[in-house]
C-alpha cells in the first residue's frame, strides 16, 4: 500500500464525514484526444467532463494549439516542453469542479524552446540570458512541477474554501460570504 493510500484511508477512517472518492487508477489522456472527445466544449468544460467521468486524470501535452486552433490552456513557451508536460486533476464533489492538484513537465531543451518561441510568436525572447543559455546548450536538461499542497489538503479534508487550510488575509466580502456559509477561514 502506497503512502497516499495509507494517508487517505487514515483520514477516511478518522473522520466519518469523509467518504472515499479517488478511483484506483488514473486516466491518462492527451489534450488533443480530450478535444476530439468533446469538440463542442471549452477546455475547462472538457476537464470537468472527463474528471466527472473518470475521477482522476492526467492531461498530457498542454500549451500548443490543438486541431481547433486553440490551446488547451496557456503555457509559457520557454518553460515546459508542450509535448512532455501535463496536469493531474481530480473530481471534487464538495464544489462540483475539476480540481488541479499538480502540474509537471520536462523543461524545454534547445529544440523545443526554438520551436515553441516560433509558435508563440515571441522569438525575441531567444536573446534573453536564460533562453539564450538553453539554446546554446549551456544549461542542463531539467524536469519540474509543483504540487498544490493547499489544494491537496482541501481535497483530503473536503473543505469548500482554500482559506480553511491556508492562512491568508482575505477581503471583507470574502470573509462575509464565508461566514454566511458557515465556513471558518484561517
Enumerate the language-model features and the residues they cover:
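Extended, charged alpha-beta segments that form solvent-exposed binding/catalytic grooves
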Residues: 1-45
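A translation/RNA-centric and nucleic-acid-associated enzymatic feature enriched
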Residues: 28-186
Amino acid at each position: 500500500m502506497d503512502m497516499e493510500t495509507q494517508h487517505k484511508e487514515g483520514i477516511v477512517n478518522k473522520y466519518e464525514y469523509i467518504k472515499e472518492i479517488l478511483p484506483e487508477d488514473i486516466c491518462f489522456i492527451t489534450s488533443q484526444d480530450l478535444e476530439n472527445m468533446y469538440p463542442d466544449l471549452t477546455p475547462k468544460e472538457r476537464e470537468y467532463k472527463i474528471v466527472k467521468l473518470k475521477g482522476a486524470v492526467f492531461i498530457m501535452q498542454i500549451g500548443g494549439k490543438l486541431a481547433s486552433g486553440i490551446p488547451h490552456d496557456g503555457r509559457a513557451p520557454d518553460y515546459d516542453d508542450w509535448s512532455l508536460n501535463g496536469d493531474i486533476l481530480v473530481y471534487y464533489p464538495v464544489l462540483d469542479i475539476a480540481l488541479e492538484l499538480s502540474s509537471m513537465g520536462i523543461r524545454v531543451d534547445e529544440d523545443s524552446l526554438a520551436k515553441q518561441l516560433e509558435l508563440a510568436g515571441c522569438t525575441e525572447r531567444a536573446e534573453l540570458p536564460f533562453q539564450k543559455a538553453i539554446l546554446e546548450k549551456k544549461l542542463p536538461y531539467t524536469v519540474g512541477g509543483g504540487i498544490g499542497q493547499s489544494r491537496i489538503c482541501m481535497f483530503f479534508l473536503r473543505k469548500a474554501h482554500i482559506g480553511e487550510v491556508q492562512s491568508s488575509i482575505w477581503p471583507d466580502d470574502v470573509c462575509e460570504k464565508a461566514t454566511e456559509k458557515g465556513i471558518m477561514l484561517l
